[in-house]
Amino acid sequence: MADVKISEIAQELGYTSKEIIEKANEMGLEDIKSPNKKVSSEIAEAIYQYVQSGEILDVVKKIAKPKKESTAKKTTKKDEVKKEEKKTTTKKESKNPAKAVSEKKDEVKKEEKQPENPIKNEILEEKKEEIKLDEKLGSNLNLAKRRGLVIVKKKKEESNETQINNEEKISTQATQGLSLSMIFSNSDESLKRKKKEKKNHPVASKKENTTKMDLLGDKDFADISLEDDDMVVLPDFSIKENKPAQPTNKKQPNILKQSLNNSINPFGEGGIQRRSRKKPPKKVEKKESEAITSVSIPKEIRVYEFAEKLGKNTGEIISKLFMLGMMTTKNDFLDEDAIEILAAEFGVEINIIDEADEFDYVKDYDENQTEENLSQRAPVITIMGHVDHGKTSLLDYIRKSRIASGEAGGITQHVGAYMVEKNGRKITFIDTPGHEAFTAMRARGASITDIVIIVVAADDGVKPQTKEAINHAKAANVPIIIAINKMDKENANPDMVKTQLAEMEIMPVEWGGSHEFVPVSAKKGDGVEDLLEIVLLQADILELKANPKAHAKASIIESSVQKGRGPVATIIVQNGTLRVGNTVVAGEAYGKVRAMSDDQGKALKEIGPGECGVIIGLSEVADAGETLIAVDSDKQAREYANKRHEYNRQKELSKSTKVSIDELGAKIKEGNLKALPVILKADVQGSLEAIKASLEKLKNDEIKVNIIHSGVGGITQSDIELASASENSIVLGFNIRPTGEIKERAKDKGVEIKTYNVIYNLLDDVKALLGGMMSPIISEEQLGQAEIRQVINVPKLGQIAGCMVTEGTINRGAKIRLIRDGVVVFEGNVSSLKRFKDDVREVAKGYECGVGIEGCNDMRVGDYIESYKEVEEQVSL
């Protein structure tokens, strides 16, 4: 019998593949993990029978016997644990009645003792009444109790009730955690010791002028010792209440001074005013002297702001940083590490607050969301892989379009989003570039996707960008499907691809792994239908849901400026529904959605969850990767955008200029760097980011690229003016063309404009420009060597060396090096070269000649002359 797929069994039974896999696992068939797993007809029959009736056939029992035994053991262990728990609960219950009986016995004893001392009964009733009053009066009565303790220290009389309260305090300190019955039993024992009977006294009022008694005079309190040390330990909160009365005592001597001044000096009022002027500085000193133990500061804080928060002098902070090896000014920003070090130095606890939370509209949106009205949404699929492995060609076949043929150089250079329908269900595809310069785009694609398809060429195998794409997908914790493309080629080797990916922990299902490997041919269309079926099955397992009735939340995957339309953004809606007329905010950009269209240019009225589209109406070009949120009003959107803009502007303007002492030398050296000023313009935001990142990497110890301005859109007159103001600057355009007027303007100003549509060509040209600006490498080429055998002194000419050429040739005009005993004595140029009486251009090996060296009059017999020339080599990055 033929094998049957799990997905086919699910279709017959009317269940999802995920539910059938769970049922199979319950039966003990734990090797079934994928909807595409094929099983024999007998096991398929057994699964069918188990789903319908819950019976497990003998065929399955034979396979799953050992696993069932292990489960049985687990259940028995659980039963034993439950029995033990029941035993412990019964023991606890049996212990509780014993306590209750003992408490009852204590109560019976108390009742028997009560008729013996009727006075004790009255005192106990008084104590009960006092406890009730304590509960009613609360903190006021507590204050009265504390006053009682202070009065005892001063040996003043107190009421009998305060004495009882003191007894209660001492007893509670000794017997904390005891029950009321234990406390009353202790009070009975203390009453037995007393010889004198006490009379009933009224309850003490809260006022201070109540009846007082001498506690020390009573012999019954001889055991109680109230020392000064004990009094210090007990807090007296009543002192805090009397604090406002203290300033009146301080002012009294000032009034006496005023009266004295008035009597002595008729101008006493002036003196009083002068004294009042001297007072404020003293108050300030007191405030400054107060130590700050904890403070909350923002993430972005300057040195002087930090000093103000800590109540320190700015110079003190700067000197402390200097001692730690950091040179700063008062306007420099402090990073988190520096803040922590300073906090430890000054002994202050610091709580760092992120100011960005004030305008974090995404956080506000997520907090207000509830799991209501959830429905299934379209899956978002990202196609990733190495350059030229056929990602766009595969998407072309799926969409029945020809995108790849229209792309410059046959490579994708921006992110695109497309919608496809399969079996009546929508699927959103994101196509990402494979070139190494577009790392940020691939990371952005992986972060907003549900499933990643990694395309690998069967004839080429795993490449660096393939590995990078897999790492991005793993970092985003997204399911991975491998599409082995170019299976129509003769040298296709899918097994090689599988082994290479297995080394990266991407194991195919056939080898016991969890990743689907689908062989496809984007050219002929083989295997594409299977790929789409697997994508939909994977989406069913993920159970992707969203609330279409909520405010829209979307991710901007690409943005640009289009003539006649303004800022345009390609988005994928993640939750809610975006409609025409909605007010939105995305980073520093905001506005009303004026129009929407799909990937083929058809107008749309709304975009649902998981769907993609292009929107028009933002105030400016939003950053790619930014989150777009629909808000209630234009005012709210403008407020969010303006706060973000101001925050980013302050951050940009106040970039820290601090440098460590070790880096100071490197900074001074950097001032001597040559720089190529560049104005960069591109068609979309993503391409602009990629080119900027690539250009910034083109640098060494001598030269670098300085991007003085960059932006999305065409080249404008202001760009030409800026380029003309900067020396040796050029304008680079990517996928854009300047108008005739701009070309004329650039020609008049002497500005060079270069435009490209392939990123390789742009980077190669910039490398060549940088190489031309770099200092050439000068190398020496050895020409020949001669031995001096005779030195002739010629009047007015100086010394002439009679030489024998031992190696190579000696040339006129070449550089000469005079060597004596292996040491260079002199370097210069050949002034004259003669053979006999004739001037010659060069003398070859084995011939004699006369050589004159410019400015050298110290030649000796036995010295050697070395002839060489300097060669310049152009440097390239």
Swiss-Prot record:
<dbReference type="InterPro" id="IPR036925">
    <property type="entry name" value="TIF_IF2_dom3_sf"/>
</dbReference>
<dbReference type="Pfam" id="PF22042">
    <property type="entry name" value="EF-G_D2"/>
</dbReference>
<feature type="region of interest" description="G4">
    <location>
        <begin position="485"/>
        <end position="488"/>
    </location>
</feature>
<comment type="similarity">
    <text>Belongs to the TRAFAC class translation factor GTPase superfamily. Classic translation factor GTPase family. IF-2 subfamily.</text>
</comment>
<dbReference type="InterPro" id="IPR015760">
    <property type="entry name" value="TIF_IF2"/>
</dbReference>
<dbReference type="InterPro" id="IPR000795">
    <property type="entry name" value="T_Tr_GTP-bd_dom"/>
</dbReference>
<dbReference type="InterPro" id="IPR027417">
    <property type="entry name" value="P-loop_NTPase"/>
</dbReference>
<dbReference type="InterPro" id="IPR009000">
    <property type="entry name" value="Transl_B-barrel_sf"/>
</dbReference>
<feature type="compositionally biased region" description="Polar residues">
    <location>
        <begin position="245"/>
        <end position="265"/>
    </location>
</feature>
<feature type="compositionally biased region" description="Basic and acidic residues">
    <location>
        <begin position="66"/>
        <end position="115"/>
    </location>
</feature>
<feature type="binding site">
    <location>
        <begin position="431"/>
        <end position="435"/>
    </location>
    <ligand>
        <name>GTP</name>
    </ligand>
</feature>
<dbReference type="GO" id="GO:0005525">
    <property type="term" value="F:GTP binding"/>
</dbReference>
<feature type="region of interest" description="G3">
    <location>
        <begin position="431"/>
        <end position="434"/>
    </location>
</feature>
<feature type="region of interest" description="Disordered">
    <location>
        <begin position="66"/>
        <end position="127"/>
    </location>
</feature>
<dbReference type="Pfam" id="PF11987">
    <property type="entry name" value="IF-2"/>
</dbReference>
<keyword id="KW-0963">Cytoplasm</keyword>
<keyword id="KW-0342">GTP-binding</keyword>
<dbReference type="GO" id="GO:0005829">
    <property type="term" value="C:cytosol"/>
</dbReference>
<comment type="function">
    <text>One of the essential components for the initiation of protein synthesis. Protects formylmethionyl-tRNA from spontaneous hydrolysis and promotes its binding to the 30S ribosomal subunits. Also involved in the hydrolysis of GTP during the formation of the 70S ribosomal complex.</text>
</comment>
<dbReference type="InterPro" id="IPR006847">
    <property type="entry name" value="IF2_N"/>
</dbReference>
<dbReference type="InterPro" id="IPR053905">
    <property type="entry name" value="EF-G-like_DII"/>
</dbReference>
<dbReference type="Pfam" id="PF00009">
    <property type="entry name" value="GTP_EFTU"/>
</dbReference>
<feature type="region of interest" description="G1">
    <location>
        <begin position="385"/>
        <end position="392"/>
    </location>
</feature>
<feature type="region of interest" description="G5">
    <location>
        <begin position="521"/>
        <end position="523"/>
    </location>
</feature>
<keyword id="KW-0648">Protein biosynthesis</keyword>
<feature type="binding site">
    <location>
        <begin position="485"/>
        <end position="488"/>
    </location>
    <ligand>
        <name>GTP</name>
    </ligand>
</feature>
<keyword id="KW-0547">Nucleotide-binding</keyword>
<dbReference type="GO" id="GO:0003924">
    <property type="term" value="F:GTPase activity"/>
</dbReference>
<feature type="domain" description="tr-type G">
    <location>
        <begin position="376"/>
        <end position="543"/>
    </location>
</feature>
<feature type="region of interest" description="G2">
    <location>
        <begin position="410"/>
        <end position="414"/>
    </location>
</feature>
<dbReference type="InterPro" id="IPR023115">
    <property type="entry name" value="TIF_IF2_dom3"/>
</dbReference>
<dbReference type="Pfam" id="PF04760">
    <property type="entry name" value="IF2_N"/>
</dbReference>
<dbReference type="InterPro" id="IPR044145">
    <property type="entry name" value="IF2_II"/>
</dbReference>
<keyword id="KW-0396">Initiation factor</keyword>
<feature type="binding site">
    <location>
        <begin position="385"/>
        <end position="392"/>
    </location>
    <ligand>
        <name>GTP</name>
    </ligand>
</feature>
<dbReference type="Pfam" id="PF03144">
    <property type="entry name" value="GTP_EFTU_D2"/>
</dbReference>
<feature type="region of interest" description="Disordered">
    <location>
        <begin position="241"/>
        <end position="290"/>
    </location>
</feature>
<dbReference type="InterPro" id="IPR004161">
    <property type="entry name" value="EFTu-like_2"/>
</dbReference>
<protein>
    <recommendedName>
        <fullName>Translation initiation factor IF-2</fullName>
    </recommendedName>
</protein>
<feature type="region of interest" description="Disordered">
    <location>
        <begin position="187"/>
        <end position="208"/>
    </location>
</feature>
<dbReference type="InterPro" id="IPR005225">
    <property type="entry name" value="Small_GTP-bd"/>
</dbReference>
<dbReference type="InterPro" id="IPR000178">
    <property type="entry name" value="TF_IF2_bacterial-like"/>
</dbReference>
